[in-house]
Amino acid sequence: MIMNTRPIIGITMGDPAGNGPEITVKALAHKELYENCRPIVIGDAKILEQAVRFVGRPDIRIHRCETVGDGLFTYGTVDVLHLELIPDVESFPIGEVSVAGGNAAFQCVKKVIQLALANEVDATCTNALNKEAMNRALEFYKGEYSDGHTHFDGHTEIYAAYTNTEKYTMMLAHHDLRVVHISTHVSLREACDRVKKERVLEVIEIADKACKDMGIENPKVAVAGLNPHCGENGLFGTEEIKPAIEMAKARGIQAIGPIPPDSVFSEALGGWYDIVVCMYHDQGHIPLKTVGFVYDRELQEWKAVEGVNVTLGLPIIRTSVDHGTGFALAGT
């Protein structure tokens, strides 16, 4: 890792048609951030200059960099490792799915992974990309700019592919609630089929290690059930969750469950568990976003959109926002 008291954080700009560039400018407008790290945005400098105008911050200057070493890392200046992705920013459609936007977002992710693997940045943080736009681009260019890849389910799978990682999972966190997933971006039918003993054990082990890496000693790993009431003690359901839990216990992990999904998250919020292993995407996303996303009924707008996405199991650090591209909000 790079030896410095302030780590270098590579931040992707996200889909240029979304609100990622604007969110980035707003985030980097906080002076205290520069006291803790050295951020550098990976993207098209012209898009970030446009974002500065959108958010009304003429006091912020965009500094184009050819290498990470060119960064000034000074408050009031946003360093951008420039990639020429959108030739004509003025004619680029904001708030729409496009091949150009999808390709731009993908190239930023690919580049930041390369930088992390080369130890040029200490950690990575990704803004949202639009999966439809990205996959349109991958298919349109027939893998020419993606090392032959013509489809990715999302960020997690891109990181796994470009770091040659086989065992990984997504963790969402909001204060004391942490959730990890057996599967993510697949249909519910397929998600049920993926609940296998080997995969459940794998994710329990990843979750246990992640908690220990975060400084939690002897973490309590809750494992959610799949069927209502966890199958009523065997009356129905044939998933292999319980055997995986027993195997994890035999390996010294404090795994607990299976626990009914309608109560495990409240218990985790109350401090009973340090992390919850969820059987599929929405089982983990819904409770976390229920506590992290707050909608103001009177103002008819989001009051808070909080949560951090972390990919576990990678050889590099990857964090992300826990929301989408916000096409409807871009440029406003």
What is the predicted role of each segment?
Residues 156:
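Active-site-proximal region of nucleotide-activated glycan assembly enzymes
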Residues 159-168, 173-177, 312-328:
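Short, flexible loop segments at boundaries between secondary-structure elements
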Residues 2-152, 194, 200-279, 283-309, ...:
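Contiguous, glycine/small-aliphatic-enriched amphipathic segments in soluble metabolic enzymes
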Residues 164, 172-194, 198-201:
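Ligand-binding beta-strand-loop-alpha-helix segment within the catalytic cores
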